[in-house]
Amino acid sequence: MEAVDALLSRVSAPRLTGAVPASLLADMVQAAQRAPDHAQLAPYRFLVVTGEGSSALGELMVAARLAAAPDTDAATLDKLRLKPLRAPMIIVGIASPTPHPKVPEIEQLLTAGIALQ
């Protein structure tokens, strides 16, 4: 019942500080790779963002916001720009289904969702 206990006691950490040990990150990726995947397509990708990448992500978020809502005020843009800097690491999950004759896109999206969770 250890797995059930782990799921039932899981909570999100509101603020993270310090670097994430490489071994923990490797364990997380290895666990994600155990998601059900009928044809071993691995229809997901992980992008680890740290350091300068966090600043670049903030700028990208601002650019996307301005493209969608050009009238966004400066204070909101500044807050958005700084958001990725609140954590020492961001793991971006990307669903990337590929055409397959036996595995429909919806199944690949479900696999990605399980892996990313």
What would you call each of these model-derived segments?
Residues A32, I91, P97-Q117:
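Small-aliphatic-rich amphipathic alpha-helix that forms the alpha element of a beta-alpha
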Residues M1-A87:
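N-terminal amphipathic, basic helical "cap/leader" segment at the start of enzyme domains
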Residues L16, G93-I94:
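Short beta-strand element of the conserved SAM-dependent methyltransferase core
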